[in-house]
């Protein structure tokens, strides 16, 4: 079996009640993690729960940052070709989150807010103010983290992995430079283009608002 490890900032997040039905233990934990913009996965002999977009490994250890450079002759016909896009379409849509909870003592539905307007309202109604506030905070972190979404197609590198970090150096346009947190890494291979990777990344925690 695995030894559990929970990031300190998630250790005291309130969960009043959650039902597990027709899903594996891993699926159940993944569903709970997503509610708080977190990720859960096995790492060695540990099963770890931590925030998405953190500037550290899921195991709690600092990750090496992999630097990517645009090659001098960046042409599609070259094996070293890099293609990248940044989507900032959701940057200013919401600045805050509202979540509802049922106040049993008063017999009314109440709301809590995280951030400032314009607000996104969560559809689910929560069982306590603490649970609603935690859910709103997790959604707000997700909104800030995904304010910029980076997609890169580049030469393959086995060190590139989800939850890792990349650094785009001065060979990149100014609006792309800096650290990014990898959300997904997809490896591809073909005779024509060789071993390639498609990277999907967002801002790491602490960089939001660049």
Task: Label the model's feature ranges.
Residues 3-78:
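Short beta-strand-centered interaction patches in the first periplasmic/extracellular domains
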Residues 74-210:
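An acidic/polar, Gly/Ser/Thr-rich interaction patch typically located in mid-to-C-terminal regions
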């Amino acid at each position: 079996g695995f030894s559990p490890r929970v990031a300190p900032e998630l250790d005291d997040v309130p969960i009043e009640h959650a039902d597990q039905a027709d899903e594996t233990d891993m699926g159940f934990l993944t569903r709970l993690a997503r509610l708080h913009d977190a990720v859960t996965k096995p790492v060695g002999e540990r099963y770890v729960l931590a925030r998405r977009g953190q500037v550290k490994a899921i195991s709690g250890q600092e990750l090496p940052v992999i630097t990517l450079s645009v090659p001098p002759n960046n042409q599609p016909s070259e094996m070293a070709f890099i293609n990248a896009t940044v989507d900032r379409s959701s940057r200013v849509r919401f600045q805050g989150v509202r979540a509802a909870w049922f106040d049993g003592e008063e017999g009314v539905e109440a709301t809590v807010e995280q951030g400032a307007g314009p607000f996104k309202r969560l559809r689910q109604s929560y069982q306590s103010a603490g649970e609603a506030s935690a859910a709103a905070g997790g959604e707000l972190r997700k909104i800030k983290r995904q304010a910029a979404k980076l997609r890169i197609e580049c030469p393959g590198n086995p060190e590139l992995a989800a939850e890792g970090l990349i650094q785009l150096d001065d060979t990149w346009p100014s609006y792309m430079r800096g650290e990014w947190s990898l959300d997904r890494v997809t490896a591809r291979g073909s005779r024509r283009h060789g071993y390639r990777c498609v990277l999907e990344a967002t801002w790491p925690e602490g960089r939001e608002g660049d």
